[in-house]
Design a protein with these regions (language model features):
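Conserved beta-strand-loop-alpha-helix hinge in the C-terminal portion
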Residues: 189-211
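H-loop/switch region of ABC-family ATPase nucleotide-binding domains
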Residues: 169-170
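Conserved ABC ATPase "signature" region
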Residues: 88-105
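Conserved ABC ATPase signature
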Residues: 109-113, 117
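Catalytic Walker B motif of ABC-type/P-loop ATPase nucleotide-binding domains
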Residues: 134-137
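Helix-to-loop junction immediately C-terminal to a conserved catalytic motif
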Residues: 31
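The feature captures the beta-strand-to-loop junction immediately N-terminal to the Walker
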Residues: 16-18
Length: 213
């Protein structure tokens, strides 16, 4: 139940709140994945209704196993590209794999990779889709600190491409590493939204201190 929400384009938005607050529902609604999705999203002078948002939004699920479909990493990325020019698509896929350091796995079956490697394949597919809004649902769930840092680096690189990212997360370290705007959800409503400043920092510190008790 969100009447109005403005997000600076190109932001890395941390979507924060307690379990059951409505964060994942918000993410699915944003992407137009819910049959009950309502409202509209405006970006670059265009307005997108619920059934149109799926064309401009891409979701990387918490369990990326649910969105890996092909027999090789290369094919997985090609699936998201325009293949009308096969040579150009292959070149783009190679470039994306190189940027995410997964070129060595180009011929590997995605399901044979580690959790972190699978996630990078999912991120590669998100880049290949060329969609302007990318939503991540708990991208560091189950990852250690080293791999969390790598995910944060990947997210910052994505942001540098001009994408607007929404990160549904309970990970304060990930937030500190890469988020620059925040949406706090409670009981299905946006309680507050803001960039980094003294007030938002104090709010986040109180929330995560309470959550850890």
């Amino acid at each position: 139940d969100i009447s109005d929400l403005m997000i600076p384009q190109g932001s890395v938005v941390g979507v924060v709140g307690n379990n059951g607050a409505g964060k994942t529902t918000f993410a699915n609604n944003l992407c137009g994945l819910l049959k009950t999705a309502k409202g509209c999203m405006s970006m670059n002078g265009k307005t997108y209704m619920a059934n149109q948002r799926i064309k401009t939004c891409y979701m990387v699920m918490q369990d990326v196993n649910h969105q890996l479909f092909t027999e090789s990493v290369m094919d997985e990325i090609l699936l998201s590209l325009d293949n009308s020019d096969e040579e150009k698509a292959a070149h783009e896929a190679e470039s994306i794999m190189e940027s995410l350091h997964i070129s060595e796995f180009r011929d590997a079956h995605p399901m044979s990779l580690s959790g972190g490697q699978k996630q990078r394949v999912a991120i590669a597919s998100a880049i290949a889709s060329d969609k302007q809004v990318i939503v991540f649902d708990e991208p560091t769930s189950g990852l250690d600190y080293r791999h969390m840092k790598k995910v944060a680096e990947n997210l910052r690189e994505l942001s540098s491409l001009g994408k607007t990212l929404f990160i549904v997360t309970h990970d304060p370290e990930l937030i500190a590493e890469c988020c620059n705007y925040f949406v706090f959800i409670e009981n299905g409503k946006v309680l507050w939204s803001d960039g980094w400043n003294r007030i938002s920092r104090e709010r986040l510190q109180r929330f995560f201190a309470f959550e850890g008790d």
